[in-house]
Amino acid sequence: MVFCVVSKGMPGRVELPECDIAVFGFGGLGEVDYEKELKGESEKFEEAARLSQKLNCGLVCGCKTLSRGLLRKSVAVADRGKLMGISDMNHVLDGEQFKSGVGLGFYKVNGCKIGLCIENDLMFPDTFKALSLCGCNAVIVVMEEIKDGIPPLLIRAYSYLYGVPVVLCGGRTACFADVSGAIATSVQDVTLFEICPQNKYHIVTTRTRGISSDIKSDY
């Protein structure tokens, strides 16, 4: 499974190598107004879907969506001509101007089960734990930019702990972490990461108090 991370350029305006899933950051679609999309005044989501059909691959694009005055950080997902859905960032920190979304982004794209993590959601481990339990083959993280070394550190830890490879697109930087704890970083305009999905499980036992196994005769 080959992921192509585009750190510079917009869908349709950059030459892409052959890949299974192409990932664009927040510069991919820019700001998308739902009302204009519905009225046909803009066709950004449709253009993304058409491009995925042209390239015969999945397409993951960061964007900011506007709906009735509410601004959200979102990711649009298309698969070979079909718009699969739009997922929103769930966690808004310290009075940011954005509105929080609800639910996890989980899609089957080009035969691969991918989970989405958007910007602030990276700071919350439950996001990755839930996506791992859902059976994701990979998690894609989309951020506006990587300001320090924390995001690469986190994706490395999450990939190792939860057994899911992670691809990160953050501004001009692309990162990849696999389940072994290895990490790769690139500042090229276009970067390819190859993932071999694995489903390795461990039997983990624990002891706890309570949950009595005694059968009561007066039940």
Question: Model-predicted segments: where are they?
Answer:
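Active-site-proximal beta-strand elements of phosphoester/diester hydrolases
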Residues: 1-10, 112-121, 140
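Structural signal for conserved beta-strand scaffold positions within catalytic alpha/beta enzyme cores
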Residues: 5, 61, 88, 116, ...
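Residues at the C-termini of beta-strands that transition into short coil/loop
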Residues: 7, 81, 170
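Cys-nucleophile CN-hydrolase/nitrilase-fold catalytic domain and related Cys-dependent amidase chemistry
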Residues: 10-80, 147, 151-156, 160-164
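Short glycine-/small-residue-rich Rossmann-like dinucleotide-binding loops
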Residues: 27, 118, 144
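CN hydrolase (nitrilase-like) catalytic-core segments centered on the catalytic cysteine
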Residues: 40-60, 128-193
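Glycine-rich beta-to-alpha transition loops that act as phosphate-gripper elements at the mouths
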Residues: 63-66, 122, 170-171
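Active-site catalytic loop in hydrolytic enzyme cores
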Residues: 67-134, 153-154, 161, 187-189, ...
